[in-house]
Amino acid sequence: MNTKIRQARPEDAKLLAWTMLMAGRSHMKIGIWDLIISQPEDRCLEFLELLTLQRPRHMCYYTEFLVADVDGHPAAALEGFDPVNNGEDTVTAPMVAVIQRMGLTPEDMAPGQQNLAAFMTCHPESTEGAWVVEHVATRPEYRRAGAISKLLEAILDKGRKQGFHKAQVGYYIGNTPAESAYQKAGFKYLDEKRHPAFEALIGCPGMVQFVRDL
């Protein structure tokens, strides 16, 4: 298989939306975006597709992602970002715009929002000075083709070129394929968070954080 890594484009929005939703779920059935959006899967995907295209630039904007084309087909994606200048707080205004475009109300989104506190008990904290790798996923038909290894290499190089000397990535405890991929890319265990409220909500004990030098 021929794999090419490239910058994401606006026409990749559907792939990026799927990547975000699946990466958020990891190997479980529910993830952070299910909670935030609190809608059926098709509506979650619509929301995330719009979010990747919603200006101004933010953490989940399409420009932050890299895509792996396998034999000419978009097969996998991930993103890397600066948590200080382009972190989670940058998503708030674009999300509000998408909520308005989709006609969602606070009542529509309330069920998942009520569970966010339980999720955040294990949400990894940013490591000082680290480039953050996030939203990593491969279409099922292209798994084991080496796309993630090449994407990780490329996104780490992107962080390195932006002046970062360290990178971090987090994953759900029990996601063995993710653990193996990150170890192969040079990441090492830093810490983990476990909480019974998180496990009751998600189905796994918590989250692990890996780091590596760049």
What do these predicted regions represent?
Residues 25-52, 98-104:
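Conserved GNAT-fold acetyl-CoA-binding loop/helix
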Residues 67, 73-82, 132, 137:
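Conserved beta-strand in the GNAT
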Residues 84-130:
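Conserved acyl-donor/pantetheine-binding loop and adjacent beta-alpha core of acyl/acetyltransferases
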Residues 39-65, 69-70, 75, 114, ...:
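Active-site rim helix/loop that mediates acceptor-substrate recognition in acyltransferases
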Residues 165-168, 172-176, 185, 195-214:
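C-terminal "cap" of GNAT-fold acetyltransferases
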Residues 4-18, 25-31, 82-83:
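A short beta-loop-alpha structural element at the N-terminal edge
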